[in-house]
Regions:
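ATP/NTP phosphate-donor binding region
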Residues: 1-78
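Short acidic/histidine-rich motifs immediately flanking catalytic phosphotransfer sites
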Residues: 81-85
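Short glycine/serine/threonine-rich phosphate/pyrophosphate-binding segments
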Residues: 18-19, 94-99, 129-133
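Internal gly/pro-rich beta-alpha loop/helix module
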Residues: 115-185
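Short Gly/Thr/Asp-enriched flexible loops that form oxyanion-binding sites at enzyme active sites
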Residues: 88-111
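Conserved hydrophobic helix-helix packing surfaces used for dimerization/oligomerization
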Residues: 7-9, 113, 148
Length: 198
């Protein structure tokens, strides 16, 4: 992995950053970066450099609107030349819709924009957020994809072909009518024949 790669992580809200409160798990401003820095893998020398942009207020993905899509697009546009790729952390309820919208909004894209999130908050035991965010960052830094996509539960999907299939399974998303762009296992296996050329 090229350690000079720079990835912009855009935290819009969602389950991945929720923390416990007297009312259950809730989103809370300012707590996600410490959670992110607690992940051992991101301190490895071969891991890409990254910078976090946190939305204020954090978005409830069940209430996301066109204006929120525009805001995400503007954040990417304003930082486009500074970074090699983007990871958008988003609630799962409408992640596929936002990824699809951004795929049409971001014209002539030649860098990866990878959406991800989690079914279990990052602060909890067994959180799927750990795998999802680490692999999403590595995919964004790989230079192998140049489009809006969605990584979740070991699958890299084309953003505008993805859909949420389960509210409970960790493999929550799929693209039933389109092949996966990649899968993760011991290695990240890219399917170059279905990835759009740069």
């Amino acid at each position: 992995m090229n350690t000079n790669k720079r990835i912009c992580i855009i935290y819009t809200g969602g389950t991945i950053g929720m923390v416990p409160s007297e009312h259950g798990y809730v989103p809370k401003a300012g707590v996600f970066e410490p959670l992110l820095r607690s992940i051992n893998d991101i301190h490895r020398p071969e891991f890409p450099d990254w910078e976090l942009v946190e939305f204020s207020p954090l978005l409830d993905s069940s209430n996301i609107a066109v204006g929120d899509w525009n805001k995400i697009g503007r954040v990417i546009d304003q930082r486009y030349d500074e970074f090699d790729g983007f990871v958008v952390l988003h609630g799962t309820d409408t992640m596929a819709y936002t990824a699809s919208a951004l795929s049409f909004m971001l014209e002539n894209l030649n860098k990866p924009v990878v959406f991800t999130g989690s079914q279990i908050p990052l602060c909890m035991l067994r959180s799927d957020g750990l795998d999802n965010i680490v692999n999403a960052i590595l995919i964004a830094a790989s230079g192998r994809v140049h489009e809006v996509c969605l990584y979740f539960g070991g699958r890299l999907l084309r953003g505008n072909r993805s859909t949420k299939m389960s509210a409970d399974l960790l493999e929550a998303f799929d693209s039933p009518n389109a092949p996966h762009l990649a899968e993760t296992g011991i290695d990240i296996q890219y399917h170059d024949t279905v990835i759009r050329p740069k």
